[in-house]
Amino acid sequence: MTEIEACIKTVRTPYRRLFVFPSRIVAQGWLRQSLSLLGVRTVPGRLCLSWDEFKKRCFQCAPCAHRTPISEPLRLLFAHSVVQRNARQAAEGRALFCNLIPPAYAQDGAVFVQWLARILPQLGSWQRRVESHCMPPKDAVSRNTFDGRDARAYAQSAEAQDLQTLKAHYEQFLRAHALFEPSWDTPQFCAQGNTYVIVYPQLMQDFAEYAPVLQEAARATAGVLTFLPVPPFRQDTPLCCFSNVREEITAVALQVERLLRTGTPVSQIAVSVANLEELQPYVEREFRLRDIEPEVRAGFCLGAHPAGRMFSQLREFVRSHGTLKSVRALLLNPHIRWADPQGAQAVVQYGLQQACIRSWKQSGTYCNVWLQAFALHCERTEQERQHQQCAQRFFLTLLRFARALVEARSFVRMQKAYGAFRAACLLPASAHTSGAEEEIASSAFASCSAGEDDAVMARCVCVLQELAALERRFAHVVPPDPYSFFVQQLAQQMYVPVRAGVGLAIFPYRVAAAAPFLHHFVINVSHEASSVRYQRGTFLRADVRAAFGFEDEDVTEAFLSAYATAQTVYFSCSVQAFSGVQRPNRFFSNVHPPVSSTLTGRASQTPSPAGIASETGGAVPQYPAVRYEEDALQAEQDLYAQGAPVPSSLYRTQQERLRKAASLIPAAGRSYIRDSFAQALPPLTAVLHARHFHHAAVKVSQTDLNLFFRCPAAWFLERVLDVAPLSRRPRLVDPRVLGVFSHVVLERLYNRIACEDECFFSAHMERYRLWTQEAIEQVFSERAVRAGPLVWALRAA
């Protein structure tokens, strides 16, 4: 029994002893586990709290009773306003900052906004430390940091003066709007009639900021607070080291499959992955190939999701004046449901045909390449005219509403412009919404996508609504480019989708440390990926940070120990990752290769040892042997490569692929590649005679012969049926169009020379140049050459 389980078993009604865990995931896991530990059917939800929930419930800032805490978006808005003020004053020769923002970069200060916003919450702690070091010591014992003279010299430095200026302007802004910075004030602890057990405080990143208050409360009232530290980590805990990360992921998937086959519930198995951002696609694919549905319990930035990326793509589309690259990225995004998908496809195809690569600047103004292309009217058939009209109608609608959205000068106008854009360009909101998102989805600014896309878009709109609400109260700090600020907010705003909880839980490293899973796999425990350091005062130089006591805290060992408290935990790493060679975490002394080589498809060698029991009662086993025939994917590979026996069973994915392959096998009959077409199809025979015969003689060229002897089928498709490969690569001029154009111009030139001069005279070279220019003009006007608006503009120039 672990120490956490022993503590929970001591709880009695009315449940006044509450437990505080490092994360919400861990708290929810122990809340479910408490039912079986206490032998009851229900417990209050407050029995197990996360650290963030505990801070909201129990910490109060008494001096700020009539003020509200400042939000992160408002910090960014303030940083924008300070940067703008610094730019204005720098132009007059009296800049606010000379160190934080060098005067040479004052006019481009937008790049410092994010950094300045991150500094603001730390300024209170910075000032307290500077003031304490500037005071003379109370005794003769010398400090290990700055002495008073050095601290006073630093306080007069350009960096310290700039930080003081920033803090003064920030304080003035907070007072003017009845706000306060929570990290600046010393909170007061209120137990609310409960006692608390804080579990593994070493894992909580900001615990050091609240530790003095909690320790004072624990001394003042006996028993109100109990701290349960992380147990020591056993360095002889086995770490299985694979040759590469693919083998490691495969081994974990096979072991999870083995546990599921033996009856272990999927809810009792978890996988934590260090550097999940890099490995997530490969981990998900490996489990899905083995019919195990993964559920990634990780958040992502709204702006990084394909649906949320629509807003940054709209900005690129408008501000690049419609480059083909930006148009394709926007219109071919499968997570955007356009109201007219045929129109979106028509725009992309039209842009490729007309070489609408990018707009150009002429006489100081931009000429939109798409508008120029639509004005050329190069369509020759009714079908092409309809295609052009469809593309033009969609593009003009998109351009109009996208410009109104991106060029809006305030968040309120952006909100209205998005409503118009959604109504004109996107499908109505999905009817399949639930929960809190239903009200958002039914509003005037709802998203158009379904499922996760719909939830992401709804959350993006909520961010816009929050910014509009801030603007109504703080209109003077609205940035000059509201849309770019909104896109930056989406790039930082984390979103954690609600999962059904029916698949295999996959967590980022650290999130599920100490969670009560029966089997916990910790992947990629390399030194680089699994090292955890908490840093404070990162805006200062390393020597200044050390002098003022902003020490880094290495909690790598604490996290490893927290993972090892699980009932059964598997640690693994690999020598070769996707990013290069890596080494195992330094806290493991028992590093060994996988016991069974069957994890990579070879015969089994020796069974695994039983494992090492941890001091907390759990076990830390090595990877057990997995029989060769259990891996149907490896068996299929060996079947094709080595002629191995047919696997006795197949995964669902293998069965579906086999059925699909069988459906593609054509029935016996005529081969359109090998069999002759002579007199088989009269219309085809007529095309052959029209294009490749002159009376009874066959027209032969070197190009045709080269293509025919290289591949007769390719010659037939390209030369007879006029089938060309579809290319998505934009070209200024289509080579085929340019070739036909050149042939026609030269044919007219030589015919005119033959008629008027009867033969070529070098003395008439100037006349021939004039005739060539006239032929080019005639071909452009008569044949409506699809050379693209850029070529037409160059021709006119």
From Swiss-Prot:
InterPro entries: P-loop_NTPase (IPR027417), PDDEXK_AddAB-type (IPR038726)
Record's protein name: Uncharacterized protein TP_0900
Lineage: Bacteria, Pseudomonadati, Spirochaetota, Spirochaetia, Spirochaetales
